[in-house]
């Protein structure tokens, strides 16, 4: 097998380009067959949805790990380092592992159509998880579901976090069409857990689930969560499940939406625990007592979950928050959180809020800014180092038409972060948002120069 450096490996991968999106499963299936079908060597949870996929995946992976299992977690995109996409028990894989997996997949990629970036990285994830003998893999889709490269799995549970209008050029221009695409991950006789709220979309998912003889568990109907109180940088809530009530559950991930995300993860774990207990009753000898989901391990795994770049308090002086907020729903969630926590009307320690915003050119930037502008005192518009970044001057020009907030353009994320931090006043709060790419570049800058 050829050998290349880690840098050369990444250069080859990124040269495949983001716009090489091909929604079909034949290519990935062919590659995996040549690799010995690594995706069949572990149990899996498969997660689709518009927002919250990564948080839910992280909760489940943390809980399974705290329950004694060896767990792989595959998410995208990465914030700083490509290896973040492939984690095993909370640790990203090594550079050497990435190169080995890439070369193995590259050698198997000899079909009529060359694989895309996402197909190759997905095959790499399955190769790495099989090689490391993980017992569980928690797998996040890239886009959609039905024809997403991850949809070669036969999971134990599928999850659709929520739905909104996104990637319409690929997934369809109505919620019902998008629901049908994401519902394509539903497998025969495999439970679906979902937080989808729109009735028309729920009906689509119910129809697919019925055809596949798959039970469906819906947040708000079959299980729910009730927030009890906020703790320092976290939330406590009661989980009302399908057959259990767990009080004083705690997540350190911030925002009202994380209570629902937590509940979805807990519903998955409740189903897995029920299945585990049924197996124990059948044959007590086959169960490893050190590898068991319990209420205690679930509680611990939930409370320990971290998910970088999502309402992450990364610096205390000045207070700096990073949140990807890369689409309309995420921007709305962020604006609600900021309005509550950092508005000028706050009775305790009122603060001035500076936002650093950069948005990609395929996002509804006008609608996103309508949510974000009212909560800020000043906005610095910038752009990530990626071709799809929207010109920050375009963002500023629109901002000027809808409000009187003070604006500034600083083309480079590093310079924008440095300017905001060095010019921060007493009690200042800085929030960096609009794109996971902006979040990643800002996070790297802060960790390097300010911590």
Region spans (language model):
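C-terminal helical cap/extension that packs against the catalytic core
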Residues: 198-207, 211-216, 319-321, 328, ...
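Beta-strand->loop->alpha-helix junctions that form or flank phosphate-binding loops
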Residues: 195-196, 210-230, 251-256, 293-304, ...
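Nucleotide phosphate-binding/pyrophosphate-handling subdomain across enzymes
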Residues: 40, 131, 136-141, 148-159, ...
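ATP-dependent carboxylate-amine ligase catalytic core
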Residues: 25, 32-40, 66-153, 169-171
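Active-site-proximal loop/hinge segments that shape catalytic or ion-binding/gating pockets
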Residues: 435
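Short functional linear segments
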Residues: 1-49, 56-67, 74, 110-112
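Conserved catalytic-core segment of NTP-binding enzymes
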Residues: 145-147, 154-213, 365
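Short Gly/Thr/Asp-enriched flexible loops that form oxyanion-binding sites at enzyme active sites
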Residues: 60, 146-156, 443-447
């Amino acid at each position: 097998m050829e050998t290349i450096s880690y840098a050369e490996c990444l250069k080859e991968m990124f040269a495949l380009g983001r716009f090489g999106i091909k929604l079909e499963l034949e290519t990935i299936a062919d590659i995996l067959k040549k690799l010995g079908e690594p995706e069949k060597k572990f149990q899996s949870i498969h997660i689709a949805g518009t927002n919250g996929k990564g948080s839910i995946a992280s909760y489940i992976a943390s809980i399974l790990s705290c329950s004694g299992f060896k767990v792989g977690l595959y998410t995208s995109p990465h914030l700083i380092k490509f290896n973040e996409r492939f984690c095993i028990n909370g640790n990203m894989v090594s550079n050497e592992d990435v190169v080995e997996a890439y070369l193995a997949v590259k050698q198997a990629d000899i079909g009529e159509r060359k694989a895309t970036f996402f197909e190759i990285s997905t095959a790499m994830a399955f190769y790495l998880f099989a090689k490391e003998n993980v017992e569980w893999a928690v797998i996040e889709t890239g886009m959609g579901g039905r024809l997403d490269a991850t949809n070669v799995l036969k999971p134990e549970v599928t999850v659709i976090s929520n739905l909104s209008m996104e990637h319409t050029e690929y997934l369809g221009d109505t919620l019902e069409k998008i629901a049908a695409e994401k519902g394509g991950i539903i497998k025969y006789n495999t439970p679906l857990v979902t937080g989808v709220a729109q009735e028309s979309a729920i009906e689509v998912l119910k129809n697919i689930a019925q055809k596949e003889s798959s039970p469906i568990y819906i947040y708000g109907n079959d299980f729910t969560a009730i927030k009890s109180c906020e703790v320092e940088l976290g939330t406590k809530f009661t989980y009302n499940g399908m057959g259990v009530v767990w009080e004083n559950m705690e997540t350190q991930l911030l925002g009202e939406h994380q209570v629902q995300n937590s509940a979805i993860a807990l519903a998955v774990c409740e189903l897995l625990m029920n299945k585990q207990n049924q197996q124990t009753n059948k044959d007590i000898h086959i169960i490893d007592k050190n590898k068991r989901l319990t209420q205690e391990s679930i509680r611990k795994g939930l409370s320990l979950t971290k998910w970088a770049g999502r309402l992450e308090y990364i610096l205390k002086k000045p207070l700096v928050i990073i949140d990807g907020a890369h689409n309309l729903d995420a921007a709305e969630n962020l604006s609600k959180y900021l309005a509550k926590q950092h508005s000028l009307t706050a009775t305790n320690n009122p603060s001035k809020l500076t936002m650093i915003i950069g948005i990609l050119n395929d996002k509804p930037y006008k609608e996103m800014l309508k949510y974000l502008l009212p909560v800020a005192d000043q906005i610095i518009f910038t752009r990530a180092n990626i071709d799809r970044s929207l010109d920050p001057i375009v963002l500023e020009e629109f901002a000027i038409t809808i409000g009187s907030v003070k604006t500034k353009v600083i083309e480079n994320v590093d310079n924008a972060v440095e300017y905001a931090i060095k010019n921060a006043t007493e009690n200042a709060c800085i929030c960096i948002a609009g794109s996971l790419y902006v979040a990643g570049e800002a996070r790297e800058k802060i960790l390097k120069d300010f911590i």
